[in-house]
């Protein structure tokens, strides 16, 4: 599926505008491996609060449109999640 088709499908999703905005932003900035970005940085980039960003990311995950993979440093510290569009 090409990007234009994904944008068109996004318009018809039964989700809030914030979720559509996140999906389109990730579509623009991510590659096949996805993108590693913090919820805070993602929200700041698109103008949403951290809580709204987090809720909408989980909505997209439950709709099976997004994979969320946790990342850890070598010493076990928590890093930002990796988001990959399906």
Specify the residue positions occupied by each region the protein language model found.
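Short recognition helix of helix-turn-helix/winged-helix DNA-binding domains
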Residues: 1-45, 51, 65, 76-80
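Winged-helix/helix-turn-helix nucleic-acid-interaction surface
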Residues: 54-86
